Amino acid sequence: MSAAAANTPSSSATILPFAEHSKVARDTRPLRLITCGSVDDGKSTLIGRLLWDTKAVKEDQAATLHRDSGKQNDLGLPDFALLLDGLQAEREQGITIDVAYRYFATDRRAFIVADTPGHEQYTRNMATGASTADLAVLLVDARTGILEQTRRHATIAALMGIRQFVLAVNKIDLTNYDKAGFELIAHEFRDFASDLGIKQITAIPMSALKGENVVLSGKASMPWYEGPTLVETLELATVRSTQSGGFRLPVQRVSRPGESFRGYQGTVAGGSVKPGDSVVVLPSGMVANVKQIVTFDLVRNAAVAGDAVTLVLDRQVDVSRGDMIVSIEAQPLTGLAFDAQIVALQPGGIEAGKRYWLKSASRRQRVSVQPVSQLNLREGEWQAHETSLPMNAIGKVRLSFDETAIFDPYEQNRATGSFILIDPDTNNTVAGGMISAKRSTGATEEQGDRVILSLPAGLAEKLLAGELLAKHRDEIDIRRTDAATASRLIGDLD
């Protein structure tokens, strides 16, 4: 987005063309978003205004708002931030500490919004809110512009996989609706965001307190701005799909109500499945076909990401809580060593080399954590750092497991690519993390000392189901291909 051209419809709404607002094939799934930015930029006020103008505030809340606003607001308008600041400490200090989640809806879409703290000491709370969001609304005070904490939050949001950003230049009324100042801020953020790989940016000048360009248009005060309001932009945003990748079912429970029934229960974390599909149980590598998909009251002909189901297989296989049932043709990564990025959440930080409990989906196992580098948020650069990571630090680490771990890269699947670290001494959650890649550890793999076997699919599945190969499932690289390609590959080896 060119900031200088922010007053044109095509450039001010880069998520989707605003000019075709009524014609766009709209994604109607609920949108999860996060508001972030430096302290006192107006995040809570903005969400409060969204709730107020979309009629999401109940009568008793409205009465309380009018009663309490007189204590803190001298502008003649309700203090909309009071709808969000729920902790006593927040109200006394006039800041956000915890992550507050709120729900609102328009005629076109529903929204779940997380209001996150702006103070540096609560960076961990902001990272938590960003981990489930599809879009970030980054607030900037029109008087002060881009600050260090603004860059910090944009960087964290990008690390958490958010690719859609709204740059909300708030309090524009306090600059006498200065167009040049708005364009300068938008241009500065565009340059910074390009280094983070952020391309979908919509810059909007607004006054959250007055409600200009939030839900209702601010054209009366800003005739130079012809782009969308915040709500119009949110209505056109897209939601990350988890149904397009491989099937993933982290097993939460094995159901045995009687001798004749054995089902594997969990919530589908990715892809889809239907009766007759071939699946593999990880980490054992046992292969089976889906016989039936059951919910609490009916038998289904398919299941997709987000569905809580019981899966019945066509043969007896050894499955327990923590295993993952996946599609054969698109399997996750399995191994004993992975690279990851983490956010330290507790005052003690992350100790180098210490063994923690790692929990991902329904699987829990012991892991050793070795920091590699730490993100310098002021400079936006990764710096070598092999000692302990302090609280609020973002670091790259190496994870070493005693038993086979199962992950997808976080970029491909948030549910199976994320994890938490638990201190075994205190049972506190000390870090949240994202898998970036599997790390090679075996000497033979590094030296290329491997044998390629080309087998018919049926025979390969039988071999993998055997006890010997099942024990070495994490060392086997399966690549499915057609007979012609297999013949060509074997010919290339001669």
UniProtKB/Swiss-Prot annotation:
InterPro entries (alphabetical): CysN_GTP-bd (IPR041757), CysN_II (IPR044138), CysN_NoDQ_III (IPR044139), G_TR_CS (IPR031157), GTP-eEF1A_C (IPR054696), P-loop_NTPase (IPR027417), SO4_adenylTrfase_lsu (IPR011779), T_Tr_GTP-bd_dom (IPR000795)
Keyword presence, Nucleus: no
Pathway(s) of this molecule: Sulfur metabolism; hydrogen sulfide biosynthesis; sulfite from sulfate: step 1/3
One term of GO molecular function: ATP binding
UniProt keyword list: ATP-binding, GTP-binding, Nucleotide-binding, Nucleotidyltransferase, Transferase
Renumbered residue ranges of the record's region G5: 207-209
Ranges for region G1: 37-44
Protein name: Sulfate adenylyltransferase subunit 1
Assigned EC number: 2.7.7.4
Source organism superkingdom: Bacteria
Phylogenetic placement of the source organism: Bacteria, Pseudomonadati, Pseudomonadota, Alphaproteobacteria, Hyphomicrobiales
Gene that produces this protein: cysN
Domain tr-type G residue range list: 28-242
Reaction equations catalysed: sulfate + ATP + H(+) = adenosine 5'-phosphosulfate + diphosphate
